[in-house]
Amino acid sequence: MTQVFQGRSFLAEKDFTRAELEYLIDFSAHLKDLKKRGVPHHYLEGKNIALLFEKTSTRTRAAFTTAAIDLGAHPEYLGANDIQLGKKESTEDTAKVLGRMFDGIEFRGFSQRMVEELAEFSGVPVWNGLTDEWHPTQMLADYLTVKENFGKLEGLTLVYCGDGRNNVANSLLVTGAILGVNVHIFSPKELFPEEEIVTLAEGYAKESGARILITEDADEAVKGADVLYTDVWVSMGEEDKFKERVELLQPYQVNMDLVQKAGNDKLIFLHCLPAFHDTNTVYGKDVAEKFGVKEMEVTDEVFRSKYARHFDQAENRMHTIKAVMAATLGNLFIPKV
């Protein structure tokens, strides 16, 4: 066995090399095939996995739970009311306790420093299910979905539309640069990515040959796009900025006019979900009443169109998370990459 992944944590995309990320994407596709064919793959038989959630989730919790069970492991959910991270007990102390009881830890919350402390002090692999800075497990699902549709990654162009400072935008930018994917951020100047994130991405882009573009010009942003990607306009914990964001981001909505500007009939649309594309939710109705906006980051027309791949993308969360857990905890033979 070669120790390529065994015992390693996945806290941000930059933790792994291009070859390692490509391997995990391909390994995910393999595990997806095994799942579809009903072939058992209990690589984590007898392992116990802690799922720590400061932030609520549908897809991340469901993906980690089903992935762990498919791998033969036992997942244990610990929500915000079950854990005392930094409140009544330090993150260091919590990590040391959990590391003696569990074989691996997933964390979804606010602070990147917290997930880093869990990895530093637990002594077991820790996987970032989302923080305010990064969303690495989402990226594997996103780029697996892209590869499934185009058969490759290098040289493609992905355009992210909306809040260029959020965790998904950060992760798309850096991961794309590592993998040789051209990444355009289509966003108002007020929400351009932080300079240090852009600098990091540009460094990777020089190695991979990818192009990075940050712009508020729609024509420049989407010309030749293969993938249009968007996310919610207001992230968890920023609800007080809703009115400001609705007004600021309305011109960056993914609608059919923007799709047509790309001039690519094979284009696909991605969204990490949940999406506010209609008023069929309490939240959507409330926004419509307060702000007169019935569709936010994406129109219902695009969301339900032939371009949409977001439900494939959501399913791929499970397969890619499974690959990360198996590779870092399963004592598998993985040729050096």
UniProtKB/Swiss-Prot annotation:
Catalytic activity: carbamoyl phosphate + L-ornithine = L-citrulline + phosphate + H(+)
Binding site for carbamoyl phosphate: S57, T58, R59, T60, Q84, R108, H135, P136, T137, Q138, C272, L273, R317
Pfam families: OTCace, OTCace_N
GO biological process: arginine biosynthetic process via ornithine; arginine catabolic process to ornithine; citrulline biosynthetic process; L-arginine biosynthetic process
Chief subcellular location: cytoplasm
Keywords, ordered alphabetically: Arginine metabolism, Cytoplasm, Transferase
One CC-aspect GO term: cytoplasm
Official protein name in the record: Ornithine carbamoyltransferase, catabolic
Functional description taken from the UniProt entry: Reversibly catalyzes the transfer of the carbamoyl group from carbamoyl phosphate (CP) to the N(epsilon) atom of ornithine (ORN) to produce L-citrulline.
Cellular compartment(s): Cytoplasm
Gene3D superfamilies assigned to the protein according to its UniProt record, in alphabetical order: Aspartate/ornithine carbamoyltransferase
EC numbers: 2.1.3.3
